[in-house]
């Protein structure tokens, strides 16, 4: 794949050893940093390298700890704050100071908390159905609503429930979950997502960011209660047709087109 390199980074975050698998492309412009959602991987975003709308645009994507090809020596330490610190460590290792931010679902929440901590580094933010309110925990709240005896049992049942979901691409997503997530990574991440969504004042954090912002969502989720608030506060909305929570699977052409159009408006 032209221009894309794959590397592994040995990092230590909060005393925990990590091996982080990355995919990246260099260039002179400010890079895009992609943070994938739960049950996804960096490969969701590598097709950017084929898209003429991103010609010359560098990017960095990586598998979160406990996901994809990345490993974590203590999965019990995983949480959204831990993923934020991981993102900081990856950026430092890559020598990236300022960047455009794109995050999906879990990655969108991680991206929001990262942008909140370092707003001057974030040139723009595309939030693809990242958590902003309690209603966004339709996946993560299952750790509370569907109690299981152990991590493996919960994960097996979660995969089966997801497979039968009526939302577009859910079965496709479920088919690879066991290959992309370690069961021991689930509880800490899900509990953290629920806590922040319920009590983290995420909407205020998102609306207060100084950078240009887009909120992307699938047409099956066009009933999200806060969409009018986002539009009224100057956030660009991008509804992806024929899609639910996973536009990168259901309608990637439309997703990439909207991302490219948004970035064409940015000066760097």
Predicted regions and their residues:
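Conserved alpha/beta-hydrolase catalytic His-Asp/Glu region
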Residues: 137-138, 152-208
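Conserved HGGG/HGGXW glycine-rich cap/lid loop of the alpha/beta-hydrolase fold
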Residues: 16-69
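Catalytic active-site module of serine/aspartate enzymes centered on a nucleophile-bearing elbow/loop
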Residues: 235-268
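Flexible "cap/lid" loop of the alpha/beta hydrolase fold
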Residues: 112-116, 122-154
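Conserved serine/cysteine hydrolase catalytic core
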Residues: 185-239, 248
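N-terminal cap/lid segment of alpha/beta-hydrolase-fold proteins
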Residues: 1-19
């Amino acid at each position: 794949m032209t221009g894309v390199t794959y590397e592994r980074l040995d990092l230590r975050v909060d005393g925990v050893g990590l091996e982080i698998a990355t995919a990246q492309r260099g260039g002179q412009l400010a890079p895009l940093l992609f943070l994938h959602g739960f049950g996804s991987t960096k490969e969701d975003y590598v097709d950017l390298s084929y898209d003429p709308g991103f010609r010359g645009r560098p990017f960095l994507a990586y598998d979160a700890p406990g996901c994809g090809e990345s490993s974590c020596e203590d999965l019990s330490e995983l949480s959204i704050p831990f993923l934020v610190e991981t993102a900081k460590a990856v950026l430092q290792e890559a020598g990236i100071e300022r960047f455009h931010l794109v995050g999906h679902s879990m990655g969108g929440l991680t991206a929001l908390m990262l942008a909140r901590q370092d707003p001057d580094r974030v040139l723009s933010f595309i939030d693809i159905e990242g958590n902003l309110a309690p209603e966004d925990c339709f996946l993560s709240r299952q750790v509370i609503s569907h109690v299981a005896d152990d991590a493996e049992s919960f994960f097996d049942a979660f995969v089966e429930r997801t497979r039968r979901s009526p939302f577009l691409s859910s079965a496709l997503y479920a088919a690879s979950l066991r290959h992309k997530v370690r069961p021991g990574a689930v509880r800490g991440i899900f509990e953290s997502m629920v806590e922040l969504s319920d009590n983290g004042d995420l909407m205020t954090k998102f609306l207060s960011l100084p950078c240009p912002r887009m909120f992307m969502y699938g047409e099956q989720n066009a009933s999200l209660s806060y969409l009018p608030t986002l539009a009224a506060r100057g956030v660009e909305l991008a509804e992806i047709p024929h899609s639910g929570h996973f536009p990168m699977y259901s309608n990637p052409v439309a997703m990439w087109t909207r991302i490219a159009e948004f970035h064409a408006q940015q000066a760097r």
